Amino acid sequence: MKRFVVLVLDGFGIGAMKDAAETRPGDERADTLGSILKDFPQMNLPNLERLGLMNAYGKESSQMKMSDGANFGKAELMHFGADTFMGHQEIMGTQPRKPAIHPFQESADIVAAHLRKYGHKVNIIEKQGLRYVLCDDYVTIADNLEADLGMCYNVTAPLDFISFERECEIGRLVREVVTVGRVIVFGGIGNTMADLWNAEEIRNGQFIGIASAKSRSYERGYQCIHMGYGVDESVQVPVCLTDMGIAVTLIGKVADIVQ
């Protein structure tokens, strides 16, 4: 088998889907390529042009034309919401399931009970009537404040005090009982629980979590894994090819969100 490359240009869209006005009002005019060309009409991307970028776009610019030798196509997404993680999973072979969208408040009790069932120490942290979970003294489980609110939960820890592997075990237990799109497990070294407490924020009176950047988790030794709702890695291209003895290399962001 010759080398095969999947290049993901995240957010580099070529137009809106038919239901954009209904499902995401304001996005019905989304056209990243068109917007870039409007401001930079002289932009020239020869490799993408040769591969069929303008063929898929359906029109040409002053510098980039349709390619006679290109095999090209375009597809509407099947997953729900604007979610880069599920977009990657869909490209790799996952049939998306519709996740729930709700604050961690609605999941706190079931998450706490499930963790206790497996022998973990669990404390409920409450601020201004909102709750989140502290597990084994060093792992917070709360709302993600960076994506659309209610789409994801974060599992955050300072990795000088607990291993990433143990944090992932906790994350998998959370994933077993919640139906939001993603459970994001991450941490770094060099920070402490004091940094996490200082990064605690409340949004819209409904969501409480640890602001990722303020937690200092990104500064040193950052590790992260995204656990998607209904994602079965065994049917995805990287695992299938690996099982066939074909080497697969994940480079960049995709290495964090595709297994």
Language model segments and positions:
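Active-site nucleophile/metal-coordination loop of metallo-enzymes that catalyze phosphate/sulfate
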Residues: 11-156, 194-196
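Generic recognition of stable, solvent-exposed alpha-helical segments in well-folded globular domains
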Residues: 7, 28-31, 86, 169, ...
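Catalytic-site neighborhoods of secreted/periplasmic enzymes
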Residues: 89-90, 97-110, 237, 244-259
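Short beta-strand segments
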Residues: 8, 92, 186-188
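Extended, H/D-rich, highly charged conserved domains that either
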Residues: 162-165, 170-252, 257-258
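Extreme N-terminal starter segment of soluble prokaryotic enzymes
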Residues: 1-5
